[in-house]
Amino acid sequence: NQTAKLGILGNKSVMDIPYSEMSMTEKTLETFSDPSQPLANVLQNNPSIRSSTSSPMYTDFSMRGINMNGNHMMLNGIPSLFYQFNGPPNHIIERMDITSGPNAGVNGVSMSNNGTNGGATPAPGTINVVTKKAGSTPVLNYTQTFSGRSSFGEFIDVSRRTGANGEWGVRVMGEYMDGDLALRHAEKEEKNIFINLDRKGETSVTNIFAGSFDLRVNKGQRWFTYGGRSD
């Protein structure tokens, strides 16, 4: 994508941004992942990001060598709406704007707590997730996925615009996934529904995004590290 949202500076061409900036579109997510897989699989296409797990139960990755997770992500410019064990669901994302390096002046200070992954550390950059909105063309998509030993998922995506000039838009996205993962005895149940309402006026755009998200993991694995000393 040739443009990205840079905090208080608004939408800018990536060629005019004085930072290392990358914008990943919905097409990128479709190419490198699917709705049942962790977002980190897509993020690692950015050269400053490395994924520390391929597990669909967590969103653990590093940027410039510093551990990060869903805590560090912004949703439509708002920080701290997600948490360590999972970031934004893939199926609600229209675009991800990734800014590497110090940029608190334009994006503010993002969450720095890594939870059980090592405590608080300075955020090495920001990841702003932009959610899907209703476009000019109506959308009606239904997707099924199968992964692990018996994990079955269903996803729905519906959008319409209405009004005399199509000024009102609504988009509804939902998911239900349940079953056994590849790790023996590990189970995951995930269900969510999100709605995006927007109005495009002559001089302004208003957008409201809301949803409900529920994730339950049973007997999931966690990573470990070696201590700094041995006796």
Predicted regions and their residues:
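A beta-strand signature from Gram-negative outer-membrane beta-barrel systems
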Residues: 91-143
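Transmembrane beta-barrel wall of Gram-negative outer-membrane proteins
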Residues: 139-141, 146-230
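Periplasmic plug
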Residues: 23-26, 31, 42, 59-113
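Mobile, glycine-rich extracellular loop/lid and propeptide segments
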Residues: 57, 69, 80, 89, ...
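Short, well-structured beta-strand/strand-turn elements
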Residues: 47-57
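Solvent-exposed coil/turn segments that connect beta secondary-structure elements
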Residues: 26-27, 48, 66-68, 78, ...
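Short, acidic, small-residue-rich periplasmic hinge/interaction motif at the N-terminus
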Residues: 1-30
